[in-house]
UniProtKB/Swiss-Prot annotation:
UniProt similarity note: Belongs to the cytochrome b family.
UniProt-listed GO biological process terms: mitochondrial electron transport, ubiquinol to cytochrome c
Residues reported in the UniProt entry to bind heme b b566: 97, 196
Source superkingdom: Eukaryota
Location within or outside the cell: Mitochondrion inner membrane
Assembly, per entry: The cytochrome bc1 complex contains 11 subunits: 3 respiratory subunits (MT-CYB, CYC1 and UQCRFS1), 2 core proteins (UQCRC1 and UQCRC2) and 6 low-molecular weight proteins (UQCRH/QCR6, UQCRB/QCR7, UQCRQ/QCR8, UQCR10/QCR9, UQCR11/QCR10 and a cleavage product of UQCRFS1). This cytochrome bc1 complex then forms a dimer.
Name by which UniProt lists this protein: Cytochrome b
Record-listed heme b b562 binding positions: 83, 182
A cellular component annotation (GO) from this entry: mitochondrial inner membrane
Transmembrane segments: 33-53, 77-98, 113-133, 178-198, 226-246, 288-308, 320-340, 347-367
Amino acid sequence: MTIMRKTHPLVKIINHSFIDLPTPSNISSWWNFGSLLGLCLVVQILTGLFLAMHYTSDTSTAFSSVAHICRDVNYGWLIRYMHANGASMFFICLFLHVGRGIYYGSYNMIETWNMGIILLFAVMATAFMGYVLPWGQMSFWGATVITNLLSAIPYIGSTLVEWIWGGFSVDKATLTRFFAFHFILPFIITALVMVHLLFLHETGSNNPTGLNSDADKIPFHPYYTIKDFLGVLMLLMTFMVLVLFLPDILGDPDNYTPANPLNTPPHIKPEWYFLFAYAILRSIPNKLGGVLALILSILVLALMPLLHTSKQRTLAFRPITQTMYWILVADLLILTWIGGQPVEYPFIIIGQTASIAYFTIIVILMPMAGMIENNILNLD
């Protein structure tokens, strides 16, 4: 009798995706982040579901309902902090996952890569709307500032902003619709993840050498299930240390003050994982230019397959491009730092320099380095 997992119409799909999947024998721990992102998504959906049972999306009670969850609901404080810090862990894994993709040339799997970019936008939109829900000062002013950016769109901008707000300012209608979108988007993300995996399994995984590994495949289970489990343990350990010992370390103290439209906080800034994009937005004095730069800061990733000039797929054996890559990583850390600083000298000029460097490295320097390496190795 054939094993059920190989014949059952539903189980065999899972079997081909997670059990008998032919996987390169040499993929490193950098390939763990896909499963960790899956775990983060599950944690966020579950904690979010339990929070939604007690949260009220009304401007007069939203802030109090979050306080009620933390004080009166059984383990409500744990669920709330797991959800808030779960978003941070999600973005750490996302950035490392994208960074791995750039380093090892995984962007050459174009469909998978573009699906990943769409996922990144969807997760960023979800996180932004989630940040508005507690209805603290930074929630309110963050929502006001970011939604206002749409008014930079020529002709329809102002109408569009009022349409999104559901009125003439961020108010009850805005909060209600943001809650609705924040609830539905993770399920849309789950569907997009399935498409992402579908595209990935069409080509098979990349590997650290960038060479074709068809001649040397091993089954995903037990080899990579056990390897992923180690990653899961490490992630959960870091996550629970953060949740139980430093729950507010990544949050903004201003969000413990209820939203007040009459009182603007001294420094309006988003959560840490958006600071790099916020710094790029602020470094351009023109509103529309800033919005375009903000969108392009993520959309530039879609150009990476077109900008790949090297005859080798990964950066593993390309020291010049490796140097460019690590300068880019440092540049993103600088942008993250600048995004959290006030708009004054010397932060403005540092932010502008780092923003120019960000686009220059990706669009000009890395492709040039690839061509130079081809030349040195006589690969032309």
